């Protein structure tokens, strides 16, 4: 069955998430949840690192490096929404594992994995 997308942008986003997921799995992370949503936030990928750390991952894709590229598009407001969703997700767990926030930035011919891109204390702070 072919997935149905509301827009070309959503289709490109899903393909970017597929690329990020495959890359992270090659580096030992295991998928837990994809596209976790709650009121006020969303997380593209939730994965578990080999050491048990729960990794919340924002996937960003840009076709050009204008305006700082994909990684720069994870604004303080976006960080706050990811953290909000992560806190909601963590509240559903019986035990709180260690966690971190990563960004996977994609551009034509390039994938950059930024581990510990932001954290609970710095999310939402401007530059």
Curated annotation (Swiss-Prot):
Disulphide bridges: none
Gene Ontology terms, MF aspect: nucleic acid binding
Gene3D superfamilies in the record: 3.40.1350.10
Coiled-coil ranges per UniProt: none
Family: Belongs to the UPF0102 family.
This protein's name: UPF0102 protein Reut_A3265
Species name: Cupriavidus pinatubonensis (strain JMP 134 / LMG 1197)
